[in-house]
């Protein structure tokens, strides 16, 4: 049995964090293409601090209004990074919504979107007490809500009707759901509709990212406005 929780509160069991856009799909693609790990950071300053620690294998990815951040290797783009050999790379993503969707102390966490849905439901089905949390909770992203409904339908087809499953009925086509979402519209306005097509593909990434660690950045030590965290994800094979 699994349930969708729209609140940002500690999960009592294994947590499935669901995000499609803007960063979740890219993270699973990076690991599927051989990246050793993928870090999720709240902003460019923490990302740059982390890159200094990780060294030459760091791959900095982030953007503002569709343009790469200064000194970064690229944008959060499925299209631009597809097919690259990332073996040994240590990706660092600036993804504030995804970063803020996890609470300190949560340990058993899996990241799922449409692209790795098939691998996810095969690996997650044996686990008990799954909680699905759409990214952005307690104000979840529309695309994440629809993906959570899709995943719940596969993992627990007889679960009671939820808002996520109701949205899935309203948007049975994943690509249409992404296009109608605010996060999808932002990409559309930048002329990046191909990103929506790639993010809506189901089951093309054979990996499920699992949380493998959290790096703490105290504000007093690094000159930040508040304490920050960066989460490290690695491929999980069950």
Predicted regions and their residues:
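Short beta-strand segments
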Residues: 17-18, 61-63, 93-95, 133-135
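Class I SAM-dependent methyltransferase SAM-binding "motif I" and its flanking Rossmann-like core
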Residues: 116
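A metal-dependent hydrolase metal-coordination microenvironment
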Residues: 48-49, 59-82
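Long, charged alpha-helical interface segments
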Residues: 54, 71-109, 126, 142-238
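Glycine-rich phosphate/diphosphate-binding loops that line cofactor/substrate pockets in enzymes
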Residues: 123-131
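A short alpha/beta connector and helix-capping loop motif
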Residues: 24-45, 54-55, 64
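Short acidic, Gly/Ser-rich segments with clustered Asp/Glu that frequently serve as metal-coordination loops
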Residues: 10-29
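Charged, flexible boundary elements
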Residues: 1-8
